[in-house]
Amino acid sequence: PAPFEQGSAKKGATLFKTRCAQCHTIEAGGPHKVGPNLHGIFSRHSGQAEGYSYTDANKRAGVEWAEPTMSDYLENPKKYIPGTKMAFGGLKKAKDRNDLVTYMLEASK
């Protein structure tokens, strides 16, 4: 996959609303939905949001979430963590992933 490059947080916010927000919240104290709240994700490993029921695959994967790993994961989640229950086909365009990850970095702090 293409390496992560800083993108547009504004475009990333739109992508989050249209592609992620139906299953995830990202603000501090946001509830878990179908997927876990993503606040603080960049200081965690996969399968570690408190109070969320993960698949064993996510817990075992031990992915440390940083810009490059998040971008790679979002390209094809089921290939990156086989057995994940995240029902998302992925973002194929590197630019979209860069924008989304740039937004997530800011919004999840």
From Swiss-Prot:
<keyword id="KW-0408">Iron</keyword>
<comment type="similarity">
    <text>Belongs to the cytochrome c family.</text>
</comment>
<keyword id="KW-0679">Respiratory chain</keyword>
<keyword id="KW-0813">Transport</keyword>
<feature type="binding site" description="covalent">
    <location>
        <position position="23"/>
    </location>
    <ligand>
        <name>heme c</name>
    </ligand>
</feature>
<keyword id="KW-0479">Metal-binding</keyword>
<comment type="function">
    <text>Electron carrier protein. The oxidized form of the cytochrome c heme group can accept an electron from the heme group of the cytochrome c1 subunit of cytochrome reductase. Cytochrome c then transfers this electron to the cytochrome oxidase complex, the final protein carrier in the mitochondrial electron-transport chain.</text>
</comment>
<feature type="binding site" description="axial binding residue">
    <location>
        <position position="86"/>
    </location>
    <ligand>
        <name>heme c</name>
    </ligand>
</feature>
<dbReference type="GO" id="GO:0005758">
    <property type="term" value="C:mitochondrial intermembrane space"/>
</dbReference>
<keyword id="KW-0488">Methylation</keyword>
<dbReference type="InterPro" id="IPR009056">
    <property type="entry name" value="Cyt_c-like_dom"/>
</dbReference>
<dbReference type="GO" id="GO:0009055">
    <property type="term" value="F:electron transfer activity"/>
</dbReference>
<feature type="modified residue" description="N6,N6,N6-trimethyllysine">
    <location>
        <position position="78"/>
    </location>
</feature>
<protein>
    <recommendedName>
        <fullName>Cytochrome c</fullName>
    </recommendedName>
</protein>
<feature type="binding site" description="axial binding residue">
    <location>
        <position position="24"/>
    </location>
    <ligand>
        <name>heme c</name>
    </ligand>
</feature>
<keyword id="KW-0349">Heme</keyword>
<feature type="binding site" description="covalent">
    <location>
        <position position="20"/>
    </location>
    <ligand>
        <name>heme c</name>
    </ligand>
</feature>
<keyword id="KW-0249">Electron transport</keyword>
<dbReference type="GO" id="GO:0020037">
    <property type="term" value="F:heme binding"/>
</dbReference>
<dbReference type="GO" id="GO:0046872">
    <property type="term" value="F:metal ion binding"/>
</dbReference>
<keyword id="KW-0496">Mitochondrion</keyword>
<dbReference type="InterPro" id="IPR002327">
    <property type="entry name" value="Cyt_c_1A/1B"/>
</dbReference>
<dbReference type="InterPro" id="IPR036909">
    <property type="entry name" value="Cyt_c-like_dom_sf"/>
</dbReference>
<dbReference type="Pfam" id="PF00034">
    <property type="entry name" value="Cytochrom_C"/>
</dbReference>
